Amino acid sequence: MLPYMDQVLRAFYQSTHWSTQNSYEDITATSRTLLDFRIPSAIHLQISNKSTPNTFNSLDFSTRSRINGSLSYLYSDAQQLEKFMRNSTDIPLQDATETYRQLQPNLNFSVSSANTLSSDNTTVDNDKKLLHDSKFVKKSLYYGRMYYPSSDLEAMIIKRLSPQTQFMLKGVSSFKESLNVLTCYFQRDSHRNLQEWIFSTSDLLCGYRVLHNFLTTPSKFNTSLYNNSSLSLGAEFWLGLVSLSPGCSTTLRYYTHSTNTGRPLTLTLSWNPLFGHISSTYSAKTGTNSTFCAKYDFNLYSIESNLSFGCEFWQKKHHLLETNKNNNDKLEPISDELVDINPNSRATKLLHENVPDLNSAVNDIPSTLDIPVHKQKLLNDLTYAFSSSLRKIDEERSTIEKFDNKINSSIFTSVWKLSTSLRDKTLKLLWEGKWRGFLISAGTELVFTRGFQESLSDDEKNDNAISISATDTENGNIPVFPAKFGIQFQYST
């Protein structure tokens, strides 16, 4: 389940018209969400509230071998945050959990081509207005969190410098480990490219990220299928100035919709040349209540590979649809007595007297469009050829919009998430839903590998719900055991 402060951060981006889908950090967010979702490792309780329209608080408790907790505070001067924030009772489940990310390629436009976009998309209009607005107001966000009993601290500051630029500062401080790390981000988003310059005090790490969108300009036809597809290529480069250790990777992402069903799908291909790691993912919405993802990893140096699968199954609320259907069945037809359809009535005669004869009006129009026969035949052939293509494109767009509207109008009550890996031989199960105003997440991670307990670190062993002895593992008495189990409750007002 998405933490409360992450919901506030997402609302801040929405209110300031900052798109996170162009970030290279989130280029593989869909596959990570479906495969690497987090399993609670203990009993966790989070209570949050909005004290003022600009301040938010959150209190966390967890029982992981001992009672731990944290206190968070967030302040933002962005206006209309309440339009994007909802409490745990009113928020839709698909907005409160991490799930398949549907991209909006229409948002990827440059300033020069912004005038060519359709005015039907209100989000595009808002972004276009923001780009050309000379009265841009700088907005800020301040976040702090303190953990206890460890007294660790973390903080974040976000400053919108202009409609296209943003500055971010993150810091972590640990008194126990004598660790103090400060990371600075400067981001520039031109909607065709998003560039990030990063500097961290840890090892004096310097980084650069860039993401370029290829399919950004709509075609001449506003109903073109290209408005629902996008191709993005990104890369990142790192260098530690102290240890002189480099790092780099590149990723290609393609997002589109099925022309027959309108269901979205995302494909990514990542490559790390230094470590020889290649990763490819395929994610698709197989239905309004189901999602599937597959990932294949391969290393060129060690010749090792891995295949992972993930899926989601959503449960809808059906009684509202049945109620509307019953109400529609009770509607009675309009009685003929309410409409005067007598041709001899005075109202009908007055209507015929005032309405002109359209046939005579058409005949009175002079014939100024006399076209030769061969040109008329060529025009008819072109009209027939293009009309069939445009009709097909319009049908595809209608199918895509119907599928998206069906998902947005659905009311989901719970979701099951499953993920497995053939090399690690693990199975993760997670259930998320709503109950009496609470957002609940409960899950477990099942392990099928012997000797798994010995491969864990001391912290991971303490996080396990059940401790398995080495004797039982070697004898095969417990071939399958839960390596992690927990439940999380969230409540916000």
UniProtKB/Swiss-Prot annotation:
InterPro entries tied to this protein:
Mdm10
**What Pfam families would the database entry show?**
MDM10 (PF12519)
Q: Does the keyword Flavoprotein apply?
A: no
Q: State the UniProt keywords alphabetically.
A: Membrane, Mitochondrion, Mitochondrion outer membrane, Transmembrane, Transmembrane beta strand
Highest taxon of source: Eukaryota
Q: Name one GO biological process term.
A: mitochondrial genome maintenance
Q: Name one GO cellular component term.
A: SAM complex
- Location within or outside the cell: Mitochondrion outer membrane
Its membrane topology, per UniProt? Multi-pass membrane protein
Quoted from the entry, the domain comment is: Lacks alpha-helical transmembrane segments, suggesting that it resides in the membrane via beta-sheet conformations similar to those predicted for other outer membrane proteins and porin.
Further remark: Present with 768 molecules/cell in log phase SD medium.
Q: What does this protein do?
A: Component of the ERMES/MDM complex, which serves as a molecular tether to connect the endoplasmic reticulum and mitochondria. Components of this complex are involved in the control of mitochondrial shape and protein biogenesis and may function in phospholipid exchange. MDM10 is involved in the late assembly steps of the general translocase of the mitochondrial outer membrane (TOM complex). Functions in the TOM40-specific route of the assembly of outer membrane beta-barrel proteins, including the association of TOM40 with the receptor TOM22 and small TOM proteins.
The UniProt family comment states: Belongs to the MDM10 family.
Summarize the subunit comment: Component of the ER-mitochondria encounter structure (ERMES) or MDM complex, composed of MMM1, MDM10, MDM12 and MDM34. Associates with the mitochondrial outer membrane sorting assembly machinery SAM(core) complex, which consists of SAM35, SAM37 and SAM50, to form a SAM(holo) complex.
Q: This protein is called what?
A: Mitochondrial distribution and morphology protein 10
Q: What is the lineage of its organism?
A: Eukaryota, Fungi, Dikarya, Ascomycota, Saccharomycotina
Q: What gene is behind this protein?
A: MDM10
